[in-house]
Amino acid sequence: MKLFVQLVLFISLFIPYSTKAVLYVDIKKSNIGNIDLVVSKCACKTEVENELSESITKVIETNLSNCGLFNVKRDAKVESWKSDTVVTISLSEVSNRNLELSFRLSDSFTNRELLTQSVVFLAKDWRKISHLVSDLIHDRLIGEKGHFNTKITYIAEEKDSNYKSVRKIAVMNQDGSNIKYLTNGEKFVSTPRFSPNGKGIVYISYTNGKSYIILKNLKDNTESIISAFEGVISAPRFSPDGKSLFISHSLSGETNILSLDLSSKRTKKITKGSAISTSPSLSPDQKYMVFSSDISGSQQLYIIDFTKKSKKPKRISFGNGRYATPVWSPKGDLIAFTKIQSGKFYIGVMKPDGKEERLLSEGHKIESPAWLPNGREIIFTNAESPSNSKLYLVDLVKKNQKMVFTPTNASLPDWSYF
């Protein structure tokens, strides 16, 4: 097996549905309190078991603490567990290469067992197992799939010995671990995007006056040119079914949105005219496309309804300022965007009909929002200066922000699907 994760999943959900329901957090309410959680590890027999158990515990604690739904109590004593949800972890060596992790999720207030599972895994896969356990805990307590085994891709940028800017496509685990560089920095690269199946990343490269759409295979690290264009290609975005790419194409003074069928390699022009139309993003059901355009004279957001014969764009942004880089929520309920007003940049969200606009973050130059697969958080670029660009997360409910650590400057992020 790939991960050699033999999930001997002894799922013990002994609590009836009526009891389980009260344990779920209503994540749409802003005044809800976090779940108090303790992660406790049992005594280990060997040094290897003890070291790995400690590492796994820390990753689980960090994952659940960072998602903003749990109040993780670190190093809490048993006598303080009176009203907490407790995760108890035990680790034992099965052979020289394999270990078995067992964990138990329980409610100390009612003294009820919520979940018990065991996982056999290779020692080198301990971090993946930590994320897997975090996902299972999140799913059981929140009633929603966790995102701890997902990845982030972005543009990593730094200066070489000649102070020349070097850009690379980077990919890492959602917690910032296991960073890999997919390109060597010899060519200009931009806007990496995960394929819906998670097997590849598409990005744009510019060479000798042409724009190339390149697909990097994440399994074997090979890459292939999907298509080459005269002019400038930008803002690629997969259709939710992964069968097409939607891109912005600038040529002969016009900038329009094209769809590219990945099987036939045929293109179709979606927008036409002298207006600058860019940043396409499809709704999860693929019936609508949101994009940014200056059709009205200033940069605004528009929707095209693919179910109608007339594909006339409908404007949905009417606030002060300019709107850019829209991206549809994976749940389909919101559209994230960048707003520029009076020299300030904002990351915001609105309903697909343009109503209920909310601004979540403000900065000197913040842009390029991308959704987490749970549809509750947004990652974006925060460029405080040309030499200081980082990735930040903001949640929709409390507007809490935190920086995502990267060893170099980082921009243009994208988050993988579940």
Swiss-Prot record:
UniProt keyword list: Cell cycle, Cell division, Periplasm, Signal
Pull one GO CC term from this UniProt entry: periplasmic space
- Signal sequence span per UniProt? 1-21
UniProt xrefs under SUPFAM superfamilies: TolB, N-terminal domain, Tricorn protease N-terminal domain
Cellular localization per UniProt? Periplasm
Q: Which Pfam families does the record match to this protein?
A: PD40
GO biological process entries:
cell division; protein import
Superkingdom as given in the UniProt entry:
Bacteria
Q: How does it assemble?
A: The Tol-Pal system is composed of five core proteins: the inner membrane proteins TolA, TolQ and TolR, the periplasmic protein TolB and the outer membrane protein Pal. They form a network linking the inner and outer membranes and the peptidoglycan layer.
Provide the function of this protein. Part of the Tol-Pal system, which plays a role in outer membrane invagination during cell division and is important for maintaining outer membrane integrity.
- What protein family is recorded? Belongs to the TolB family.
Protein's UniProt name? Tol-Pal system protein TolB
